Each structure stands twice: as structure tokens, then as C-alpha cells.
């Protein structure tokens, strides 16, 4: 299984942002640093969140503004794609929809074609929402979303792109037909350690997941956080040890 690192955790702990501006994380310069690290330490891919336009403002409520082919002005996709390839690494795309699936479906063909053109072999999709009914009045696990997920993985397969879905629907065996549906989240993830009011996931959280969530199929949990303390968030920390973070690469896949 491929391992990847990415530009995401630094936003959750508050040292950078998805939105554009002085603290924007997904810049050409910062992404090159991650690519260099990945190449040096044997990681296959580099996930980049916040690379595209639409993150400024209240994106959870305004997800219809996301553009999945237009990069932010300080993110040079062609340059970074070529740079990653020269280092033996590939960029992993990020398509956060905030649950606005109609907006995503209108752009998917162009978005996946762009990814294939630039050698982006995988995409992390996202459907962040608050509550079971989304802004478009549809249920997260309703038929509209079931149909949508099938469209995504089918179109991605045509462009030879692997899908890792966050805020997904339940795994029901689609990956037997579409093996590019590599993994999905579907559990309380690592990011809760950065900002949850209850202080983060309890130490036994990851011991339970393989025997509960893991029963339905592969799980994307984003392990590998070694800076356990979070100076920017004194009431939070990653409730773990370094050995445990490494072990999660084996016990959760």
C-alpha cells in the first residue's frame, strides 16, 4: 500500500490556513518542501489541501463556490507536477465539496482530466457537513449520495485515478468492481486531536476501530503525527506515542 504525507495537519493546528493570504499553506514553495521530504524518506505521494479556489470565506456553507480546476494564484500545478515527477513522487489531489455534490458533478469530468494530464494518480474527496441533512437539503447517506459516489469512482476509474473518500458513505463492496476505490475515512479521525473540545481521541480509540469500523473495509485514518504536543492548542494534544503512530500504519489501512 502506498504511503503519503501532506499539507493538512498544519492547518488543523492553526499555523497555516486553507484560505489564501499570508498563512496560505498550499503554496508552490511549501509544497516543494513536502515533495523533497517525501522523496527523501520514501513516501509515494504528497496530498495538498487548499490548492484550489473556493476556500476563502465560510466554505462549509458556500461549498458551491469550489472550483476543482482553478488553482490559487500562489500554487503552480504544472510546475509542481513536473517537480514531483522528477523526485519520484506524485501529487495527490484534494476535492473538498462541503456536500455540494451538484457543483462537483458539473466539474468532475474536467477535474479528472486535469489530474490525468498532470500525472495526479489519486484524489482525496471530502464531504464535510454539520448534521445529517446538508445545505442542499439532501441526506448524507441518502440515495442521491449513493448515486453520486458511484459516479465519482466510475469516472475516476476511466482516468486511472484512485479515490480516498473522507466523510464517505458506508463501504458496500464497490471496490470489487472499482478497485480504484482504495480507502475511505468514515470514523472520528486524527484531526479531532487538533481541535476537539474534549481534548481529542482517547488513547484506546484506535484499538477499537479495526474491530468496528474496519469490518466494512479499508480505512483512511492519516496516522504518522510525531509532534504530539500542540503549542498552538494547549488544551489539545495527540493522545499517543511515537511507536503507536508507526503501528497504526499496520493496524489501520
Please place each PLM-identified region on the residue numbering.
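Conserved structural scaffold segments of CAZyme catalytic domains across common CAZy folds
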Residues: 1-87, 95
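Alpha-helix initiation and N-capping motif
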Residues: 2, 175, 218, 244-245
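Generic structural signal for residues positioned in beta-strands
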Residues: 4-6, 220, 250
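Low-complexity, polar-biased intrinsically disordered regions enriched in Pro/Ser/Thr/Gly
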Residues: 14-26, 137-139, 230-238
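Aromatic- and carboxylate-enriched substrate-binding clefts and catalytic-loop regions
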Residues: 50-231
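Glycine-rich, aromatic-lined ligand/substrate-binding cores of catalytic
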Residues: 229-253
Amino acid at each position: 500500500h502506498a504511503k503519503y504525507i501532506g499539507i493538512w495537519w498544519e492547518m488543523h493546528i492553526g499555523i497555516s490556513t486553507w484560505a489564501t493570504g499570508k498563512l496560505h499553506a498550499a503554496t508552490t514553495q511549501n509544497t516543494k518542501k513536502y515533495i523533497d521530504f517525501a522523496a527523501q524518506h520514501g513516501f509515494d505521494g504528497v496530498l495538498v489541501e487548499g490548492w484550489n479556489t473556493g476556500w476563502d470565506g465560510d466554505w462549509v456553507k458556500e461549498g458551491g463556490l469550489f472550483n476543482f480546476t482553478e488553482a490559487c494564484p500562489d500554487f503552480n500545478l504544472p510546475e509542481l507536477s513536473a517537480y514531483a515527477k522528477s523526485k519520484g513522487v506524485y501529487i495527490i489531489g484534494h476535492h473538498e465539496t462541503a456536500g455540494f455534490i451538484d457543483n462537483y458533478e458539473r466539474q468532475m469530468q474536467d477535474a479528472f482530466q486535469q489530474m490525468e494530464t498532470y500525472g495526479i494518480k489519486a484524489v482525496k474527496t471530502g464531504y464535510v457537513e454539520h448534521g445529517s441533512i446538508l445545505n442542499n437539503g439532501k441526506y448524507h447517506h441518502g440515495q442521491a449520495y449513493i448515486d453520486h459516489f458511484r459516479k465519482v469512482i466510475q469516472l475516476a476509474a476511466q482516468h486511472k485515478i484512485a479515490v480516498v473518500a473522507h466523510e464517505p458513505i458506508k463501504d458496500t463492496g464497490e471496490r470489487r468492481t472499482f478497485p480504484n476505490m482504495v480507502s475511505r475515512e468514515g470514523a472520528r479521525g486524527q484531526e479531532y486531536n487538533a481541535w476537539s473540545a474534549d481534548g481529542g481521541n482517547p488513547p484506546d480509540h484506535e484499538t477499537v476501530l479495526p474491530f468496528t469500523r474496519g469490518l466494512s473495509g479499508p480505512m483512511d485514518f492519516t496516522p504518522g503525527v510525531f509532534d504530539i504536543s500542540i503549542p498552538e492548542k494547549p488544551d489539545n494534544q495527540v493522545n499517543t506515542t511515537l511507536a503507536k503512530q508507526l503501528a497504526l500504519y499496520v493496524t489501520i489501512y
